[in-house]
Amino acid sequence: MDLSELDPHVVQLFPSHALAIAKNKILEMGAITVEACENVREYFISKSSTAKEAVEELENAINLLDKKISEYLLLISHEQLNDHDSKEYFADMKSIKDLERVGDLCINLTQFFEAVYDEKDDFSSEAKDDIIAMINMDIEMLNHAMVAFDKHDLDDIIYVDDHESNLDYYNKKAKQRHIQRVTNKTEKSVIVNSTYVDILSNLERIGDHCQNIAESYMLEEENFKPDYEVDSAFNQ
């Protein structure tokens, strides 16, 4: 992670180039955030302390990038920016905050899992399946969100929007299945019962941030409508 690339001298001379440098760092931040999500999944599945420590280290890197890129973008904002660069600036500022929040949610998830594992307890196989499915959806969405952020590609934006709707629906159904297990007394762990809904909510919130990132640039367009005429395609 080379932060020396965020050279303040470039800002005054070539603000558009400085924005490109910042964007590359945000893409790097996105890749680190994906890696954090992957290690959350690994920790959940294997209970590996190495994976848990990796999440913590990656989250520290995400926080550092958030701070340094934000400072760099603030310098850029003081320069005269054309319309395109202004949109890039606002999209960049929003996206780094969404990535930082995903990093926080990754830490939340590892803490929930750790609370269960420290009690020598575990999740039911059905609960595990739902959590893994949602983590997998989050990782796929984040990958596509970063492509949408980079390329402003409508197909990737639609992909993320579509899957965010699917994630919301899956979250609702997973909660219903959990309530059924508690009612039937097939989910016996007290700590799992007390944390499971929070885990699902954190996973759903990651999806929300992915959608924000995917739409970050397009939302700066005056005529952009987040639902863009694709609702009919979703309902087919």
Language-model-derived ranges and their functions:
Residues 1-236:
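Cytosolic, long alpha-helical scaffolding segments
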